[in-house]
Amino acid sequence: YWHKSIGGYHAAKLRRYQEMIDEHIQGEITALYKTLPSVGADLSQVGDTLTPVLNMLNTRYFLIPLQQGKTIPMFNPHALGNAWFVNEVQYVNNANEEIEALHQVNPAHVAVVDKKFQNEVKASAGADSLSTIVLTSYEPNALKYEVNSPKGGTVVFAEIYYPGWRSFIDGEEVRWEKRG
């Protein structure tokens, strides 16, 4: 459980996540493989727009197949991390539009939110350059973050939502919503 996979087989794979694989991830992986001959193993040459959804999912390494069944890990310098502040919230009409909107936005800067959660997720004034969020503890059933933000903001977590999650800030339970 310490190694995360963004697209492998899992008996409990959620339908929405499978839709994300079909709509974005497969195409981004194909684009990556087509680009590799021109950049070698240096993904910093391609910028962060080639694989925005994979970056949003914090894909730190790509396992590139070689001959005779071998693979080589390739570092992704554009992975967004476990959590990050965004500058903008874009509201859409439904969950399908959340997935579609990811074709037009850069998840590093924009969170896409279903309008039915607009009262819970207020658009913030934008990320403060001094704000930080760091994953300090990772267990299968508990993630802990340390946040420092002088003016607050909207944070996106690179996690796949499962029913029953609970969130706490300074020991107090808080409401939160899943996002695209």
Language-model features, listed with the residues they occupy:
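Conserved hydrophobic/aromatic beta-strand scaffold that supports enzyme active sites
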Residues: 71-73
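Extracytoplasmic/lumenal acceptor-recognition loop(s) of multi-pass membrane glycoenzymes
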Residues: 1-53, 75-121, 161-162, 173
